[in-house]
Structure formats: structure tokens, C-alpha cells
Amino acid sequence: MFQLRNFEAIKIGLASPEKIREWSRGEVKKPETINYRTLKPERDGLFCERIFGPTKDWECHCGKYKRVRYKGVVCDRCGVEVTRSKVRRERMGHIELAAPVAHIWYVKGIPSRMGLLLDMSPRALEKVLYFVSYVVIDPGDTPLTKKQLLSEKEYREYLDKYGNKFRAGMGAEAIKELLQEIDLEKLSKELKAEIRESTGQKRVRAIRRLEVVQAFIDSGNRPEWMILDVIPVIPPDLRPMVQLDGGRFATSDLNDLYRRVINRNNRLKKLLDLGAPDIIVRNEKRMLQEAVDALIDNGRRGRPVTGPGNRPLKSLSDMLKGKQGRFRQNLLGKRVDYSGRSVIVVGPELKVYQCGLPKEMALELFKPFVMKKLVDEGLAQHIKSAKRMVEKIKPEVWDVLEEVIKEHPVLLNRAPTLHRLGIQAFEPVLVEGRAIKLHPLVCTAYNADFDGDQMAVHVPLSMEAQAEARFLMLAANNILKPQDGKPVMTPTQDMVLGCYYLTADEEGVQGEGKYFSSPEEAITAYQLGYIHIHAKIKVKMTKEIDGVKKSKIIETTVGKIIFNEAIPQDLGYVDRTNPETAFDLEINDLVDKSKLGKILDRVYRLHGPTKTAETLDKIKELGFRYSTKAAITVSVSDMVIPKEKEKLLKEADEMVSKIESQFRRGLISEEERYESIIRTWNMTTEKVTEALMTSLDKFNPIFMMAHSGARGSKNQIRQLAGMRGLMADPSGRIIELPIRSNFREGLNVLEFFISTHGARKGLADTALRTADSGYLTRRLVDVSQDVIVREEDCGTDEGIYVEEIREGNEIIERLADRIIGRVAAEDVVDNEGKIIVRRNELINEEEAEKIEKAGITKVKIRSLLTCKSRHGVCRMCYGRDLATGELVNIGEAVGIIAAQAIGEPGTQLTMRTFHTGGVAGSDITQGLPRVEELFEARKPKGLAVISEISGVVRINESKKRREVIVTDEENSISKTYLIPYGSRLKVHDGQVIQAGDELTEGSVNPHDLLKIKGIFAVQTYLLQEVQKVYRLQGVEINDKHIEVIIRQMMRKVKVEDPGDTSMLPGELIDMFKFEEENKKAVEKGLKPATGRRALLGITKAALATDSFLSAASFQETTRVLTDAAIKGKVDPLLGLKENVIIGKLIPAGTGLSRYRNISVVKKVKDQQDAQDKEKEEAEVKASN
């Protein structure tokens, strides 16, 4: 096995026939596989031991040489080398073809590479290859032209007329001859001249041809290598044949395909030897061509070759393609040792960083560690007896296991792993039973519940892996979400309910108004049953201030005292410097879910992760204890139906009948009638809900659950005890008959039927959404996987201006939220000229608030959109790592984090296109399809008309059509835009607009925006639009994640005029490479190229990456590989995927080369000490 770290890049190219023979260990001459009697491989067959190596370790075919001592001997009887049977996985063979055959990838691909090189149409090429027409190879002095096609009849006529003055041929032989004659350099010059002179279709064709010609010149591939004279045979253990129970054999499809090739090849050889008539030989050659096509890519041309049961056989191309192909199934998704899975149950007694591991599972996972320890401690003589002890499960094994697991973290993963919090590390605690115990607080991150979910356990083995698990992945260190930097470990459900109940206060309960000398006394009184937990009491608080004991009486409840014992008392909710408030409890009001989140956020910011983990455990403990003591439960009597409901419904009925009569009298249109009725019922539902919420008691269990944020919502309470309200029909249109009943009263048949529409649509929607969201995440990961923080500072002066995002008058995202954790690109100065933040400094929460208070509306920040790092991004442009709150570390895989942050909430987004009042054009795409539309840079549905010039608007309305005329007075140009029927105008007469402004409502086509307004405008537009979709669903995502993706979408430049560089017109090239090439050209005094930034959708961008391995493992595998082979592409192995594929450490985190090449140098101090010691000893000796 070669050393994995030894190579920097990997190259792909076409193999010459000599190369294929060089790889091969021998020619496969017979189609036989194994002898049915002896079950040994046939000689010269597809499994031949002489070619591929022995089937048994250290044993030749005939059995003359057995045992390791004959290692390397080649048997003189059967010719098999004595070696390991493993070589059957790596030794290749070959088949010498009797006639050349074209490689289907280069014939059929789009565009057909062979066709472009020869300047033949793919149809003509196919006719020649499959022996339908002749092609003229050398016209001699006849009126024929080179590469002209002749039918059988025409060929005969010309042959009679001119005899052998010209040469024509058919099949791959003819094409091979034509390819050999091509002079690439000359052709390249001709094409360049043609590109300069011609226009239109002709020029486009020349550019495409030049691209292929240039690829062959640069890569050193020869065109005739696209025709195969020799076919490689892959090692037999990669296309195995195994015996099934019934004595039958199961074999890989490839063996069938190879067998057909060999059979036809042998038959062709025989026919050629016999000198058979031309027509028979030709037919055999065509069949050989088809057999090789099926082997390489079955089904690409004509009907696929099928096996038993009409199943198409899997060819070499199919082995690579798709989810089950080599790339995605085996290279990117390996199964690993030292892992197990089991059902999870809740473990409320655990600490945040612990998990319960079933004993038998732990024993199996840590088996080698246990065995070594047994030997080390002398409990077993040697490893073998230790193994026996473990397998017999002797009692002393358990004690050793306890010791082994101490300080050895394990990883827990729950599928689907939507973001990096789906795998976290825990310290295992051995538990009885067979279920893994999970801490309740990490459930949110895993999205786990205990209705039968399963989780997988993995053991990190090496010291480095253990250290990374402990420091980076330990659950206690992953308290913040990488998406938005908010805590992910907030208490939920019972815990929230317990804290809510604990901190509530109630009027007129036992013990109200009593005084206590200390908090402890109050708690004792509560425990002895003298006061109620909710009673308002007075408590004397004592504190030492500057060494002097001071005290003050405050009003609170026992519950609040207990709650405050669990949290630090210096969170800044109370001003401790003010003697009036210095003694107050930190939290002296009702605590609900959002308040808990804020408290934890503060604890984290002030005290760091360790303290937060402790606080979390205390809150968990309290929450569970008091929700149990409160004994909150739900019963029908808790659903109190408001008395006003009947009256409100009656009023609504009257209103509706009024609207109906107006409609019948023709005062209002059908549309207005429908809208008014819907509005009436919506208002009524709202009123019923308000009446319900006011009538519910503050300690009503259902109200408490919803109000505390533990479970349920106002909406659900409305359906339980108010009225269900309006429902939508299958098309999404709202049905004007509302459901008047609630669930307590029960629905009647019609109401039940109406509500089934919505329920069914909801389920179908969820199923579709999960798949779509997963696919979106996959594309995002693929486009951004090589974005890694690679340097400290890229040194750019550029940045972007950010301001708050508004939708109409409503602020969607505040300025402060957008600049927290970013680096300022220039000094931020308030009105008095005082600097709030200097250039290149990180903006934190306080500074962001200051900036907003100072009335500054836009701030210039460093951004990923302007980062100048050639590979990856730099620390300054990225800013704060949201999961830690510090400046991002070098080596952080920010691309993948960004993709996960955008993809993970994808399932929560809605699928539907909202239908509002049936106006055409106002149907806007929202939710997941809208995000996809933006990231794929598609032309959106409901397109807005945008102005290409700045100027004054004039609106012309005639009966037939509406026009908007924009006039630019200064440059005296005007443009007229036809407004489609049904669109709403966004501008009015006489309004002054800028180029790129929308004239009608709807979504803008990002490509138009790029042309008119430029790069920055389109980036801002995409960013804001994606944010709008997520914000409407209440999902917070930090801008920088979306910026990473947009950066990747806009990395390429489309070359317009290549100047004197080696680039081709219309080529997509990385912008950094483009600048580099131009710099070289200018230095040599040549004309640089011109180009414009291109906007690619994420699928296109992922396929246009520099790494062919990454692109091939994403989509369109054969197309990517065909292209890469012809261009002789080199994969520099910079991203994560390509390194996973070839099995190297990924270049992120500690795998970055700058960290990997560190070696420890012994400290100088130690050397100094040693020298001093030697001196002392010498002195002592001397004195003696």
C-alpha cells in the first residue's frame, strides 16, 4: 500500500493502447469463468489464476507449491505465481480486439467530442461507426471530398468509375485513420482565425471545436486513443462470482458483458482467418462495437442488454453513477468499525456531557482496550486468554471495562444528520438494559424523541481523535447553534413548565405577606407546609458589601428564591451598584421558554460553556421536579368555552347575509363578496379567540402550557375551546363556510369532511418537503464544500454596506443583528466624530447597540462576497464563529456549516404557493421552492418587469394594453415596456427611478439584475430574498452563511474576448485565475482578456468546480469524467470531498497542512535544567 500523504494531486487522462497493455498481466482469450466440476478458474478465462493471481493464499493452481515459504515462485506446471490472494483485487488483464472499436463516451456524449474533432455531425459519425455508410478517407484526384459519406450503392458506383484512385472505409478503423491524420496545432491555428473572422452559428461551432482541440494539445492525449484496440479487464475480485446455498452461482453483470465481448471478438478472429465475405465480417464488427458499448455504458445507445427477467445489466459506467454507485455508496459513505446502534431512552439523571451506554454494547465496542488492560493488570497471561475472558464475560471484565471507559468519549449520531450538532461526543456511563440513555437537553439538537428513535455510537480510537471529540464535540461545548449563535440547549416542555410554575405568583394563598429572616427560613417554611410556593412574602436578604454585612427586605415568592439558587446572580438583569436594587433576586418575574433562552445566552456570554452546562443541569433538575410537583394535567373541563361565542357567531351570520344580499342586488362583485365573507369570518375567529384567552384562568393547565412555551399554541387552544375557523380546499382556496365548532363540542359531519382536505394536504406536503429539502442541502454542500478558512487576512479594502432589511414598513432584520460578529471595513464614527469601532475590529453586541443608537443607518463591513482569498476565505472577512462567539479559527469548514445552516431548517419551510384573492401575477412562490429558485438562479415565476435605464416614468393606458415609458432626459434615451395583463404597477406617473428598479410587482430575474445593476446589486438581492423566506417562517439564519453560497455562485467569469491569452471565448473560468492570466499577459505586453462575472445556479456551480472528483461524485458522473479525461484535468485536492474519496485526511481543522506539519521541539528549559543538574553532580563529586 502506497503512503497516502505522498501525493499532492491526482490526474485523469485517456489511456493509450500501450498503457493498457502495460497495466495488464496477460490476455484473456476465453469467455469461460470457472470449471463447473472442480470450481477452479479456467486457464486464459475471465478468472484465470495465471493472469490475476492465486485464489487461495500462497497456493498455485495445480497445488505443486503450497505454504508461504514458496513466496514469489512462479509454478513451472501451471504458471501461477505463489502470493497472497489479495492481488486478485489489483491485477488487471486485457483483451486484444480483432478490429478497433470506438469508445462510446466520446462518441455519444454531448457535445460529441469525436464529432467536434472531425467536424462531423454525431449522426454521420454513428452511421460510419455502425457500418451503415462509408466515409471518404482519401479522395485522391476524384471529385469526392474528404469525410464525405457514401451509401453502399454510391460506393459501388464510384468504385466502378474510379477504381482504387480514392480510399473510403467504414467502422472504427476508418474513423481511427481520420483521427490519426489530424494535425492539432495546425487545426488550432485555423480555428482561431475562423473565430476572429466569422460570426453567428459558425463562430459558436468553431469555439466549441477549438475547446476540444486545445484540450488535446494541452493534455498530451492523442485523438486516436478515443478508439480502442485493446480493452482492459478489471481485476476479478471487483466483479466476483460467488456460490449460493443451492449450488448455483451469482455473478457480477460485468462478467456477462465481458463474455459477450470475448465471444464476438473470437468469432471475428475466426472469420478473418477464414477470409469470410465482407458482409459477414462487417456484421460481426458491428456486433463487437455494440458489445463494447454495452460493457462501457449499457443503454447509452439503442436498447440496453438485459439479463434474466429483462433487467438491464450494470455496465462500468453504472458502477460509478448515482446513489448506489462507487462514489456515493463506497467512497463517500463507508461503514466503520467500532460502532453500534440501539434504541434511545431518556436519562434525566445524567449530566449534559454524559450518555448511558448499555454494558454489553460497551464491552463489544471497547473489546481491544479491555483485552489489553486485562493483560497489563496481570488478570490474563496473554492476549488470547484475555479474549477468551471477554467472550465468556468473567466478572472481573466489568471492573476493567469501567476503568477503560473513564475519560474515553464516544460519539452519538442520530440520522438524519442535518447539521453538525447531529453528531456529538459524550462520556459514557455504563447502564443495565439494552438501550442508550440520552440527556433530555440534547434532544433539540438531534431532533430526537423517545418514541422508538435509534441512535448510533462510534468510538474515537486514536489520541488525536479522542482529544478532538473532547474539546470540539463534547455536548457541553456545543451549546450554541452554528446557524445564528443562539443557544440550542434551551430547556423544553416539562422543564419549561416546571420553571414557569415555580416562578408564578398567586393572590390570596396560604402565607401571603409573611416575613422571613432569610431565604433559607422561607424555604424551610415552604417545606414544612406553612406557606404556598406562590405566596408573595417578604424576605430579608443579607450580603457582604466591601466587607460590611448589609441587609434589605425584598418582596418575592419561595418559588423565585428556589429558581434563583440555580442561576448565577451577576447576569446584569439587576444593577448591583445601586444600593436600592443590590439585594434583589436576579430574576424576579415569570420565566417562560424565551426568558430561559435569554438567561442562558447571558450565562454563556459572561461565564462560558462550563458554567452554562452546570446551570443547564440545575434548571433541568428544577424543571422536572416542580412540573412533577405541580401535577399539571389536561382534562376536558380545562377547555372552557367562552360565553360570548354564540353572540359573536350570530353577529357574523347577520353580517354574511348582509353581504350576500348586497351581492344579489349587484352592488358588489363576486370577488368582493368572497373576500368580505372571508374577512368577516377571520375577524370573528379572532374575536372568539380573544374572548377565550381572557376567560381562561392564569393557572389553567392548558393556558399554562401554551403561555410558558412548553407545548401547544394559541392557535391550538382556539381549536380546542374556541372555533376551528376557516379551512382551505385542495387547491389552496379558502372555503367560505367556517368550522364553527371546536374539538370539545365536536365537529359535525360536514365540518369534519371540510377539515380533512387541510389535514391530507399537510401530510402530503411534509413528505414531499423532506425529500426536496434533503436534495437542496446536498446541492448546497456540494457547491460550498471547499470553502475553508485558510488565512488570517486577505488584505482587501473592499466590503459591503449593510442596512436593515424591510418588507414594506415592517423591519425584517435589524441593523444591529446584521453587524454583530462582523469585522468593520472602515472606522464607524458617530455624529460627533467619535469612533465607535475601528477598521478591522470585530463588532460585538454592545458596539452594535451603540451604532444603532447613534442613528447610523448603514455600516461597511468585511464580507465573504468581497474576500480576496484565492482558495477558501479569510478570518477577517468571515468574522465571528457563531458556535463559539470568537473570531473564526483557521481551518474551520465554513462552507459545510453554511450549507447545513441553510438546509437544516428547510423542512420547516412551506411548500405552497399562496393564492391570494385569485389575482393573476400576484401568486408568488414562497417557502422551499422560492429558496431553490433563488439558489438555482432560475427565472422566477411571477416575473417583475424591470427598467434598464434611469429616468422619469410615463404610463400609457389604452384599451388593449398598458405601457410604461421611461425617459432619461440627460442622455436623451427612452425605453417602452409592455406591462402584461393582470400585473400590478409599482410606479406612478412622473416618478424618478433608477436602472434596475422594478416597474411591476413580482420577483426579479437575477440575471437581468446582474446585467443592469451589476454584481453588488444581485448579491444583495439574493441575500435579502433568501432571508425574507426564512424570516417569514420565523427561522433565523446569519447572513454570512448565505454569503458563502452566493460567493460560490459568482466565482466564475465568462470570457468575452480572450485577447492574447490562452483562454477561449465563452469559457467559464475562475475569477482569480482570470485575473492571474491577465496579469501575466500585461507583464508580457500582450492584450489582456475581457469578461464579465457570471451567475451560476448551485447545481451548475458545483459541476463547474476545479475538482473533477468532487463534481463526478455529485451528478452527471459520466459527463464530468469524459470531459476531465479529454482535458487531462488535475485535481488539486483542496476540498473536503475529494480527500474523503481518495482516503486522505480532510484539509480542515487539524487536517490543514499548516497544522499537520508541526513537530514538537523539546523545551529549552528542560535542557537548561539537565545541564544545571549535571553541573551540580560534578561539583558534588569534586567536593567528595
UniProtKB/Swiss-Prot annotation:
Substrates-to-products reaction catalysed: RNA(n) + a ribonucleoside 5'-triphosphate = RNA(n+1) + diphosphate
> What start-end ranges are recorded for coiled-coil regions in this protein?
none
- Offer one Pfam family short name for this entry: RNA_pol_Rpb1_3
Q: Which InterPro entries match?
A: DNA-dir_RpoC_beta_prime (IPR045867), DNA-dir_RpoC_beta_prime_bact (IPR012754), RNA_pol_asu (IPR000722), RNA_pol_N (IPR006592), RNA_pol_Rpb1_1 (IPR007080), RNA_pol_Rpb1_3 (IPR007066), RNA_pol_Rpb1_3_sf (IPR042102), RNA_pol_Rpb1_4 (IPR007083)
Q: Report keywords, A-Z.
A: DNA-directed RNA polymerase, Magnesium, Metal-binding, Nucleotidyltransferase, Transcription, Transferase, Zinc
Q: Name one GO biological process term.
A: DNA-templated transcription
Per UniProt, Zn(2+) 1 binds at 60, 62, 75, 78
- What EC number(s) would the UniProt record show? 2.7.7.6
Task: Give an example GO cellular component term for this record.
Answer: DNA-directed RNA polymerase complex
- SMART domains (alphabetical): RPOLA_N
- Keyword hit for Magnesium: yes
Co-factor remark: Binds 1 Mg(2+) ion per subunit. Binds 2 Zn(2+) ions per subunit.
Which region is the signal sequence?
none
Binding-site residues for Mg(2+), renumbered to this chain: 449, 451, 453
Q: Which GO terms describe its molecular function?
A: DNA binding; DNA-directed RNA polymerase activity; magnesium ion binding; zinc ion binding
Cofactor(s) this protein requires: Mg(2+); Zn(2+)
Q: So where does Zn(2+) 2 get bound? A: 794, 867, 874, 877
Assembly information from the UniProt record = The RNAP catalytic core consists of 2 alpha, 1 beta, 1 beta' and 1 omega subunit. When a sigma factor is associated with the core the holoenzyme is formed, which can initiate transcription.
In the record, the note on similarity to other proteins reads:
Belongs to the RNA polymerase beta' chain family.
Q: What function does the entry list?
A: DNA-dependent RNA polymerase catalyzes the transcription of DNA into RNA using the four ribonucleoside triphosphates as substrates.
Give the protein's recorded name: DNA-directed RNA polymerase subunit beta'
What organism is listed for this UniProt entry?
Thermoanaerobacter sp. (strain X514)
Q: What is the lineage of its organism?
A: Bacteria, Bacillati, Bacillota, Clostridia, Thermoanaerobacterales
The gene name on file is rpoC
